[in-house]
């Protein structure tokens, strides 16, 4: 099977989430890319509103993408876990919290980016910085880059 271009895959995942009216924001390396970094990733990390009805919408969207494992998960299990990983080589990681960041904070402040005609709610620079305060070296490097982007944007 031919590997899809990452932007196409990201747009496809988010298109399905949008069609199901899932409440989510893009976080992680994919969000950093949309803000202008060159961080490589194959994963799509989403921070969701951790309610059972919303988890159902998210799982339904991923199942429609052919991610069969999404059909086997119970929405209440997803809501109880901090992260659920769906996929193998290129995962969709469903977060109910990204370090100490919650959807209740990040959702209303999300910035919409458009990728291949799909609107993608993306965590703000401030919220991405907050989500990266983990103590990991890669996250510390990401914070430096995000702070520089914030400085350049004024």
Q: What positions do the PLM features span?
A:
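Compositionally biased terminal segments of proteins
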Residues: 1-154
């Amino acid at each position: 099977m031919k590997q899809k271009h990452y932007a196409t895959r990201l747009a496809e995942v988010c298109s399905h989430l949008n069609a199901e009216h899932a409440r989510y924001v893009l976080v992680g390396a994919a969000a950093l890319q949309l803000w202008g970094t060159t961080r490589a990733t194959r994963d799509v990390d989403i921070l969701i509103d951790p309610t059972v009805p919303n988890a159902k919408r998210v799982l339904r969207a991923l199942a429609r993408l052919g991610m069969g494992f999404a059909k086997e998960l119970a929405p209440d299990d997803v809501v109880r876990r901090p992260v659920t990983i769906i996929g193998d080589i290129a995962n969709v990681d469903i977060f109910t919290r990204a370090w100490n960041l919650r959807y209740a904070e990040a959702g209303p402040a999300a910035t919409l980016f458009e990728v291949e005609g799909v609107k993608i709610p993306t965590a703000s620079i401030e919220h991405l910085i907050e989500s990266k305060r983990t103590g990991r070296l890669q996250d510390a490097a990401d914070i430096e880059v995000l702070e520089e982007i914030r400085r350049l944007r004024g």
